[in-house]
């Protein structure tokens, strides 16, 4: 009984495999690649807000560092710059110019 069931399943599997091998895609599928989409369709799916993007890179624009002007002031003073290398910018700026 098991052999007969196994033989029937193998015959059914063989029919399914040979039937799919000879089948051709339908007219709707053959005109369009199912795995590929056009650039326009792809960009409609993945839309990003453009307000924070570099125009040439497509990466988000970094927010300006509020401490950058103070860091430049400390870099112009050789003593502050040297101390910043040892203890960090914020502490060196605080020691030379007051609170950050």
Curated annotation (Swiss-Prot):
Residues 52-98 form the Gla domain. Residues 1-23 form the signal peptide. GO terms for molecular function: calcium ion binding; hormone activity; hydroxyapatite binding; structural constituent of bone. Residues 24-51 form a propeptide. Keywords: Biomineralization, Calcium, Cleavage on pair of basic residues, Disulfide bond, Gamma-carboxyglutamic acid, Hormone, Metal-binding, Secreted, Signal. SUPFAM superfamilies: GLA-domain (SSF57630). Disulfide bonds join 74-80. Ca(2+) 3 binds at residues 75, 81. The modification 4-carboxyglutamate is found at residues 68, 72, 75. GO terms for cellular component: cytoplasm; extracellular region. The keyword Secreted applies. It is found in: Secreted. GO terms for biological process: biomineral tissue development; bone development; brain development; cellular response to insulin stimulus; cognition; glucose homeostasis; learning or memory; negative regulation of bone development. Ca(2+) 1 binds at residue 68. Ca(2+) 2 binds at residues 72, 75. PANTHER family: OSTEOCALCIN. Belongs to the osteocalcin/matrix Gla protein family. The carboxylated form is one of the main organic components of the bone matrix, which constitutes 1-2% of the total bone protein: it acts as a negative regulator of bone formation and is required to limit bone formation without impairing bone resorption or mineralization. The carboxylated form binds strongly to apatite and calcium. The uncarboxylated form acts as a hormone secreted by osteoblasts, which regulates different cellular processes, such as energy metabolism, male fertility and brain development. Regulates of energy metabolism by acting as a hormone favoring pancreatic beta-cell proliferation, insulin secretion and sensitivity and energy expenditure. This is Osteocalcin. It comes from Pongo pygmaeus (Bornean orangutan).
